[in-house]
């Protein structure tokens, strides 16, 4: 009896999403710097998208703060596990296949994963990494096509194409 219950897969998916989100500490762009309670190991000037910022270096992330003192970008440098969101999508898909009654929880989880992929894409775009942004926007569109969500995310697809064009990737 190996992983025969949907609950095992939903818990696994939840653990993967939590592992993905943990390094950011919940910090989001737009937050004032004074809400960051952790002390950086290094503070240095940097530039993001042509804007002068301060780079706060931590063990697992870099946080870029603008001159007004607001977070511009949170860049995770040491994820807890690689491809956590991809694995989480697979786990939730498996949970739904095993028990369609998990639909409500699976839909909410997939929507959260889409948001995380979109945030990754926006970060990559902000840094001028258009090819990576395109891939992340494409990944944001993929979970929305998974049952039970099955909604075409036109914004993610448009942004994937737009950033691919910026990266001169016409394939």
Regions picked out by a protein language model, each given a short descriptive name:
Residues 17-131, 144-155:
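Short coil/linker segments at helix-helix boundaries
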Residues 9-14, 26:
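N-terminal Sec/ER secretory leader and immediately downstream segment
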């Amino acid at each position: 009896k190996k992983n025969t219950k949907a609950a095992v897969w939903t818990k696994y998916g939840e653990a993967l999403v939590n592992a993905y989100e943990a390094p950011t500490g919940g910090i989001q762009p737009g937050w004032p710097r004074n809400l960051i309670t952790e002390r950086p190991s290094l503070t240095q000037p940097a530039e993001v998208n042509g804007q002068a910022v301060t780079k706060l270096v931590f063990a697992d992330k870099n946080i870029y703060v603008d001159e007004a003192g607001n977070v511009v970008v949170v860049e995770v440098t040491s994820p807890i596990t690689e491809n956590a969101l991809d694995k989480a999508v697979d786990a939730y898909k498996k949970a739904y296949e095993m028990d369609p009654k998990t639909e409500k929880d699976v839909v909410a989880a997939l929507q959260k994963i889409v948001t995380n992929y979109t945030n990754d894409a926006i970060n990559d775009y902000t840094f001028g990494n258009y090819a990576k942004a395109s891939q992340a926007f494409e990944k944001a569109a993929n979970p929305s096509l998974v049952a039970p969500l099955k909604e075409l995310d036109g914004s993610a697809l448009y942004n994937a194409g737009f950033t691919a064009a910026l990266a001169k990737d016409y394939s």
